[in-house]
Swiss-Prot record:
Role description: Synthesizes alpha-1,4-glucan chains using ADP-glucose.
Cellular component aspect of the GO annotation: cytosol
A molecular function (GO) term: alpha-1,4-glucan glucosyltransferase (ADP-glucose donor) activity
Underlying gene: glgA
Protein name per its UniProtKB record: Glycogen synthase
EC number: 2.4.1.21
Length: 477
């Protein structure tokens, strides 16, 4: 079985969000499962530099101008790059300029990605042809549409990582992207009078996956579907929408081997975690004290992530003697709020604005609780890292958070399945009640250790996801 992933980011070469983490790990896990897997990406500068052995395998004239298709390897995975310097050779973000304005030609830049994905199934590389073309998020959303227009030379899967981004462009661009106008209607890629790359993927794919089972259900409901609930309900009823959880790349996130930690540990040597906490308290300007629980946030500071709730609940957390370490950036109002809290409570609140991958490991290794109070969360990786590191996740019951964390209720403790703390309603009172439950468990050290060991024993490896995808592909062929 030959599978081609079509996407716009690849960790560690180019990352703006969780999509890159998925594509940095899933293909290698699929290869280990015996699936011949390759990845197609635009030839962005960081990717060109990272795939150093890439060679030209063909050249084509397209609606987007003259392009070359390159092929090389990165971390043992075959990588195709679309070499079109007039479209992709730009510094900084792959999506917008330095003033944060989306590039005016994004419609062409990402239509080309979908077109090449489709042409791969029709023999663009004469030596390798995919049976399954697996497209990710709106950037690759036109891939299934081009496949449909070509008579479906391969089966297509479209994965929704975040339904909030729809890839919307004016209708007149239909003349520029090589698709028939007959596709521009409600039963096609039209959405609110414009072209939606995301809707194209949802409508034309043979199967849609979301990045968790709960998110796959949620996106059939109006509050999560952004106007696409009708189509998604239909696909769900046809058995063409399902959820497969993302995994954790254990080569990168594993406290037993993590060289970014002051002290490495396993579920059997959890006492070694204490040194990481001490070092984190020092680094964040917190009072060194192993008797108080250290809560942490590693997140974009947005209301989607529920960080306004953390700010509102913070006085209650501090009153009970807890500490907070925060790493993140985003909404200026939230940034100012957390910086003000740090100034008002020195030794109890430590804030670092920005994002540093290495420091996020130190927080995960040193904190006791990781807060993920999202209003919606398609899958979420932060809580999975928390489970892996014995840093108990405190989450809202939504999306992938609901699928991965079991509340430390009396019943779950008795059944041996507790792995963190879960709250229902998206308000500060509900969050604060969960924080109080964390303090209650903290006051019982042997029980806390029991839940840590339970959390660290859970398997969210990419191997599990790779098996699920292979079963899906086999059903389609």
């Amino acid at each position: 079985m030959q599978v081609l992933h079509v996407c716009s980011e690849l960790f560690p070469l180019l990352k703006t969000g969780g999509l890159a983490d998925v594509l940095g790990a899933l293909p290698a896990a699929q290869i280990a499962e015996g699936v011949d897997t390759r990845v197609l990406l635009p030839g962005f500068p960081d990717l060109r530099r990272g795939v150093a052995d890439a060679k030209v395998i063909t050249r084509r004239d397209t609606f987007a101008g003259r392009i070359s298709l390159l092929y090389g390897h990165f971390n043992g995975v075959g990588i195709y790059l679309i070499d079109a310097p007039h479209l992709y050779d730009r510094p900084g973000s792959p999506y917008h300029d330095t003033n944060l304005y989306a590039y005016a030609d994004n419609v062409i830049r990402f239509a080309l990605l979908g077109w090449v994905g489709s042409e791969m199934a029709a023999g663009l590389d004469p030596f390798w042809r995919p049976d399954i073309v697996h497209a990710h998020d709106w950037h690759a959303g036109l891939t299934p549409a081009y496949l449909a227009a070509r008579g479906r030379p391969a089966k297509s899967v479209f994965t929704v990582h975040n339904l909030a981004y729809k890839g919307m462009f004016y209708a007149h661009h239909m003349d520029e992207i090589g698709l028939p106008w007959s596709m521009f209607n409600m039963n096609g890629l039209e959405f609110n009078g414009e072209i939606s790359f995301l809707k194209a993927g949802l409508y034309y794919a043979d199967h849609i996956t979301a990045v968790s089972p709960t998110y796959a259900r949620e996106i059939t409901e109006p509050q999560f579907a952004y106007g696409l609930e009708g189509l998604l309900k239909q696909r769900h009823s046809e058995g063409r929408l399902s959820g497969i959880l993302n995994g954790v790349d254990e080569n990168i996130w594993n406290p037993a081997h993590d060289l970014l930690l002051a002290s490495r540990y396993t579920r059997d040597t959890l006492e070694e975690k204490a040194e990481n906490k001490r070092q984190l308290q020092i680094a964040m300007g917190l009072k060194v004290n192993d008797k108080v629980p250290l809560f942490a946030v590693v997140s974009r500071l947005t209301s989607q992530k529920g960080l306004d709730l953390v700010l509102e609940a913070l006085p209650g957390l501090l009153e009970q003697g807890g500490q907070l370490a925060l790493l993140g950036a985003g909404d200026p109002v939230l940034q100012e709020g957390f910086l003000a809290a740090a100034a008002e409570h020195p030794g109890q609140v430590g804030v670092q604005i920005g994002y540093h991958e290495a420091f996020s490991h130190r927080i995960m290794g040193g904190a006791d609780v990781i807060l993920v109070p999202s209003r919606f969360e398609p899958c979420g990786l932060t809580q999975l890292y928390g489970l892996k590191y014995g840093t108990l996740p405190l989450v809202r019951r939504t999306g992938g958070l609901a699928d991965t964390v079991s509340d430390s209720s009396l019943e779950n403790l008795a059944d041996g399945i507790a792995s963190g703390f879960v709250f229902e309603d998206s308000n500060a009172w509900s969050l604060l009640r969960a924080i109080r439950r964390a303090f209650v468990l903290w006051s019982r050290p042997s029980l806390w250790r029991f839940v840590q060991r339970q959390a660290m024993g859970m398997d969210f490896s990419w191997q599990v996801a790779a098996k699920s995808y292979r079963e899906l592909y086999q059903r389609l062929l």
